[in-house]
Amino acid sequence: MIQELDVDGVPTLLAPTGGPMRAGLTFRVGTADETLARSGITHLLEHLALAPLGLADYHVNGATAPVFTTFHMQGSAQDIATFLTSVCANLTDLPTGRLDVEKEILRTEHSSRGTAAVDDIPLWRHGARDFGITSYPEWGLGALTADDLRQWAARWFTRENAVLWIAGKSVPAGLRLALPSGVRQPVPAASSALPQTPAYFVSGSRAVVLDAVVRRRTAASVFAGVLERELYRALRQDGGLSYQTTAGYEPRGDGHATLRALADSLPEKQDAVLGGFVDTLAKLRVGRIEQADLDAVVAKREDFLGTAEVDAARLPSYAFNVLTGERNLTVDEHRAELKAVDVDDVHEVAREALAGALLMVPEGYRADWAGFAAAPTRSAGTVAGTAYREKEGDGELHVGVDGVSWLGHGGPLTVRYAECALMLAWPDGARQLIGDDAISMRIEPTMFDLHPGAIRVIDSQVPAGRQVVMPARDPDRIPQPRAAGGAERREPAKRSWWEIPLMVVSGLAALAIGGANALLTLGMFITETAESDKGWLWGVITVGWLLTVILALPIVLLRRRRR
């Protein structure tokens, strides 16, 4: 049984355990509460709170998720009391002397962290806001100051916005949670960058991934288990197409949950995996759900609910529900809801999941044939403004008072200043604007015939709080036109065998006729000629000069062809 207590004004959850004591202090703040221009502030604050503690004999860690941040430890009661007391002290009096060091550690952490198949999904669904921010680097780190962190801590890391959970016999003696007073913060509203669903996008990953948002309920978590069994059977056991087939269910804190399913593949089997994945989804959508799969998933959950450690294991999710204001079920209530789930309930979840689904497909593939609309990669509109041509290509940049647009092959890209989530600014004048809808536009002054004031116009219109100054780039990394004169120089055309003889014949003929014509013209001016003869002689001279030009023309054209 989970007891609800109070420690220094912080709601506290206590459950017995037969193993080592462990505890966590969880706050209702995460990456979804940040802006892209200040992304990384919660993660940095988490690192600063832990930095002075040094090495520990027991497991100690912190974690920053989209809607919560937690500090947890496993060890003796005394060690846990010391750890959590110190964390709270550091949160109220941040060790900002380590600010630059921890920033570098976070940059190193990001650069050394491998990419996962699902990393880009949040930005495709949500854009460059709230739940989509986890897809981006922590670009805000460089500009964050000690005052920024103190203000963030004062707003989010408070007694009312925290929950303590302990798996052990009792609250450790000497534990003090000296946190400032504040208010419980609501979960941010989730934005959407998808004009219609179901939708799909193309990724460089070899995996096929389903992302869906469903109403949080027991039947939805059961559906995730049924889907995983179906994918395993179809793509691994029967087809031998995938090694990894998984499905998961994660509450979001706002009455909804994220459901994700994944199947990997070899390059030569991507087509078959995509087809098998879609077939499995279609099977569940039309209600072809195996009762045996449903029974197996429910039985597995019931086995977990019957273990001695069930209450201790449920503490983190129980704390999450307290923070987000969602209902916590007792073990008996959870067991009763599991038993009540039937095939019709799972079918209802399948329809809901697929109606709002986002499917990630490998590069070179599509999913419109299965009823999924392509997620937008271009903007629906443009802005009016001064036009600047690309030095290479046919693209055109428009810089206006409302935003910037690029018009070129594939359709326009537009970022309006009022909807700009972030602008990265380099000292050499380059700018990258990212819209709330995740549309990104890079402006390289070296690649456009820009007026010197164009960049200043953009800088003056993007709100200062959304601008991040980037370090200077190596000159070799600044793009340059391929040729200083404009288009790339072409190789001369290969000479044909007949060109030289034609040029020689044309030249000799033009020289002979032109010379004779020159002498005749000169004679007309230095000799007496009867008036009756002048008319036809000048006609002969005119025809002669025209013939000379015609004979010389092949030489001129062939020489121009060689340039």
Locate the predicted segments by residue.
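Histidine-acidic residue clusters that define the catalytic metal-binding segment
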Residues: 1-4, 123-162, 321-350
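M16/MPP (pitrilysin/insulinase) zinc-metallopeptidase core fold and M16-derived inactive scaffolds
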Residues: 17-83, 226-242
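Non-catalytic, conformational "gating/processing" segments within enzyme and secreted inhibitor domains
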Residues: 146-178, 355-359
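C-terminal regions of mature proteins
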Residues: 162-168, 299-421, 429-434
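Membrane interfacial helix motifs at helix-loop boundaries and amphipathic/re-entrant anchors
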Residues: 516-543
